[in-house]
Amino acid sequence: MTQSLLLEIGLEELPAQYVRTSSEQLAKRVEDFFKDENLAFESVEAFATPRRLAVRVNGLVEEQADREEIFKGPSLAIAKKDGAWTKAAEGFVRGKGLTTDDIYVEEVNGVEYIHVKQHIAGKSTKEVVKKLSSVITDMKFPVTMRWAAHTFEYLRPIHWIVALYGNEVIEEIGVLDVKAGRISRGHRFLGKEATIENPESYEKALAEQFVIVNQDERKALVRKQIEELAAKNNWIIPIDEDLLEEVSSILEYPTAFAGTFDEKYLVVPEPVLVTSMKEHQRYFVVYNQEKQLLPFFVSVRNGNDYMIENVAKGNQKVLTARLEDALFFYEEDLKIPMTTFLKKLETLNFHAKIGSMTEKMDRVQLLVGRLAKELNLPSDVVVTAQRAASIYKFDLVTNMVGEFPELQGIMGEIYALKQGETAEVAQAIREHYMPTSADGDLPTSVPGALLAVADKLDTFLSFTAAGMLPTGSNDPYALRRQVMGLVQILAAFEWNIEIEDFTKLLLGLDYAEFLSGKEEEVEAFILSFIRERVAQRIATITKRHDIIDAVVNSNTSSVPEQLKAAKVLSAVSESEEFKGITEALNRVINISAKAQDDASGEILEERLETESERNLVKAIQELNEKVGSLTPEELYSHLEVMAPKINDFFNENMVMVDDEATRRNRLRFLGLLSQIILDFADFTSLIVK
């Protein structure tokens, strides 16, 4: 026989972002509880609304299975003396509720120990579930609060608990002064208390009180209602999945409705209107079949359709006030010339320790030029990027961005066009913030990518040079995100810049004033920090840490080259030949590392003594002449071909011979080969089997 179990925690309104994660955590903890208690079940269902977290365990067995547990005691030498059981043995069995007659002997690692088997009768599920309170109190949350005079902390105050095993209340469950029962609560305004007779009746009992407890069901219902409104009015209503998730997490009984606003607000740029509706009001925006924004919106009420027209009017009133502000800000911003905005940037701090936003733009202009020269970019790209760099932060002091900070860059593009800038300059201004997340969109234009790299590099270098380094999980200036974005752009545009050498150069040129005598410390941190971000990027290609280390520890810090090398190693690492190739290349790296002082100078042909030595040197010299033009794939192919020549050389020749001239000569060409190998990867980091 099996039963079902229901556990519901009634709370004050939860923040939308924690509803689903908290529900999933509760379900996992309940599942683990029954697994740990050796109680089998068929399934665990999770339920959640802003006012409750609940789980139902289906097909829960009525008792634990009996089991035998083996206990190891002291060694036989201690447990038995002169043919009689010692006090140690008697104490051991007495502690298990057994006698010395139950002892048997088994050998463990060559030593005999006494053992006993204890029969443990399974407990009834009814007895075990009395301990479920710990599941509630052990839950962890990002933020917590206290209430009343209690010191106990939880995501939100607990107001009621429903705990049923079959038809019976588990009365032993409780938290603080809240004891379990079978009374749940319906919708805050439309519903009443709901008596839950058994776990199977949970959804129905609460649905009668205007609560849909299944979050996915609410989500599907909201989607269906929006699609019906779109079909009825011949609209296109894009359904943003994040917004849909949020909306379904802040209501218990959804009813979608349409509202409208004055057409005069359509002169305001679309991103402003969309942000006002979507981000600030949690509305879904409406388009016609030509994908033009319409003066309508769709919202979702937490309730039924009673007096829904009044609800729509109330929402329209709130939105109108916000759009009126947006229209005013837009019209005022259009009256202000670019020079005025740029003047204001002189008094806008980028950071008190670093300087103004104008000073940042000056540094970024220099950086754009240095990067463009390093990357050999066309002059028209440089002109566009430098013009953008000279004004790209101007929108930060506009009225619109002051009200809608999430539109920085977007309004920069719109206003730049209005001020007469070229489309390319305006696009670069918008794109310099990209990417805004790990999987966010990247710039599509070269000037935009160039400006984005320069801006991110300046932010990173100026903060770190000034000593404001991220520590642990604390990264107040989002430097990890800045550098990861930089790495992503370099990879996407295949810009082969030795980023480590370049940043060292920049520290001495443009950021020396911030360093305050800590050049070596800051430089070491910067290089390590960049390598960590590159390693994270490589981890999207391969999960093998040895390959990641091999690539990151190579001689190159060109991100595209490193990513390509990682792909090559990931592809060839499972081949039969890879172990032999790696071992051959490692012999070269290892012997060269031990004798670097002897490896300088020119390779002397007259000192080559054997055929294998001459063959290897010829191959090294040929490879060295073209290594700069080879892709990582091509370079590995050459190293693969060279591996047998390396083995032949080591089989026939000794490197560390007594003759100094011969020894030095061999170390020279092996040192050269080692550098070529390390340009691809540090093979000594690889684990081969």
Regions found by a protein language model. Name each.
Residues 1-689:
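Amphipathic alpha-helical "coupling" segments that flank catalytic cores
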